[in-house]
C-alpha cells in the first residue's frame, strides 16, 4: 500500500499484477490499481482533473492528463471517500506511476493533491539489490 496526504486529502494506492491479461512472450504486462481518495479536511472538495506520470523499466515516460477520473468528477464532503479501480498496460515487466489530482475546494481554491509514487512489479521483474 502506498499513501500520501496533501492539504488533508489522503490518497492511497493498492496495486496488483494481472497475469491473465499479461503475456511475457509478447512483452505485454498489465496491472490493476485501486485508488482511495479520503477527504480529511473541513471543506468540501471536487476532483476535476488528473495528471499521471507512468515510467516503464526502460525509463520511457508517458504522461496522461485529463478531466476527472473514470468518467467522474467526484465531490467529497468532509469525511467522505471515493474509491475506483483502473489499469495500466506496459511493455516491460515493471514500472512506476505517480502524479496528481486537481482539486477545487468549496471556496474555489485549486490545488494539486499528490498521488504517491508506486511500483508496478510482476513475477517477471528482475530484482536488483544494492
From Swiss-Prot:
One of its GO terms (biological process) is error-free translesion synthesis. Gene3D superfamilies: ApaG domain (2.60.40.1470). Residues 3-127 form the ApaG domain. It comes from the Bacteria. Pfam families: DUF525. HAMAP family: ApaG. This is Protein ApaG. It comes from Beijerinckia indica subsp. indica (strain ATCC 9039 / DSM 1715 / NCIMB 8712).
